[in-house]
């Protein structure tokens, strides 16, 4: 089972890659850093604050196994939400305004959920 040992919200001094959306965390940007232990292995998990927040808002953690939410599942869940809510039947695709990288998508979904 996954255990969170520590969670901090530092400001990036160097570029990182978000474990959820696979996009860059830029220097100067605040992000989430978790120190976790799973199956006896201690590791750090870094993600955008917005990605962590949208994962909670969309209840992505509810169907996780003992290892927690991974990036592939996060991106798949985010794609499913956008497809379900922003599908354009005329183009047989999501609306062009939603055809963005997963970090931008997470920010757009959060904004949308906060306006509901």
Give a label for each model feature:
Residues 1-9, 61-116:
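Short, intrinsically disordered terminal segments enriched in charged and Pro/Gly residues
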Residues 1, 13-16, 27-31:
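Short amphipathic alpha-helical surface micro-motifs
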Residues 18-21, 48:
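Short cysteine-rich clusters marking metal-coordination/redox-active sites
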Residues 4-15, 36-42:
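Short, flexible, mixed-charge glycine/proline-rich loop motifs
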């Amino acid at each position: 089972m996954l255990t969170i040992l520590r969670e901090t919200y530092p400001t990036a001094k160097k570029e990182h890659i978000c474990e959820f959306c696979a996009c860059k965390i830029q220097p100067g940007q605040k992000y989430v850093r978790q120190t976790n232990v799973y199956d006896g292995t201690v590791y750090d998990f870094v993600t955008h604050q917005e990605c962590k927040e949208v994962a909670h808002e969309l209840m992505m953690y509810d169907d996780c196994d003992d290892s927690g939410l991974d990036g592939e599942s996060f991106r798949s869940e985010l794609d499913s939400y956008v497809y379900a809510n922003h599908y354009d039947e005329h183009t047989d695709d999501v609306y062009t305004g939603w055809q963005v990288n997963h970090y931008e998508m997470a920010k757009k979904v959060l904004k949308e959920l906060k306006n509901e």
